[in-house]
Swiss-Prot record:
Species whose genome carries this gene: Thermoproteus uzoniensis (strain 768-20)
UniProt-recorded name of the protein: Large ribosomal subunit protein eL42
GO biological process, one term: translation
Gene: rpl44e
Ranges annotated as C4-type zinc finger: 4-67
Cofactor(s) annotated in UniProt: Zn(2+)
GO molecular function, one term: zinc ion binding
Free-text cofactor note: Binds 1 zinc ion per subunit.
NCBIfam families with a match to the protein in the record: PRK05767.1 (NF004425)
UniProt keyword list: Metal-binding, Ribonucleoprotein, Ribosomal protein, RNA-binding, rRNA-binding, Zinc, Zinc-finger
Family: Belongs to the eukaryotic ribosomal protein eL42 family.
Amino acid sequence: MAYCPRCNTYTEHSVSIYHQGKRRELAEGQRRYNRKLKGYGSSPKPKQKRFAKVNKKISLVLTCSKCGYKLHKSLGRMKRVELV
């Protein structure tokens, strides 16, 4: 049970792990970045020598069973997440 702001009640929610979508090559920021990489010279951003973080931040997607409203909840940093 979780609170749904659209239904304004506590309803059953299905839980899934959020996965990032595919990057769009034609997005303005991506085209700008590709122009900067073109030609001679180095990358506009410094390359990281060693990893500062060893795990990713996990985000859950709660989907309301009544109206289908999706809610994101952050779980913080974890090495492994398993939904049962």
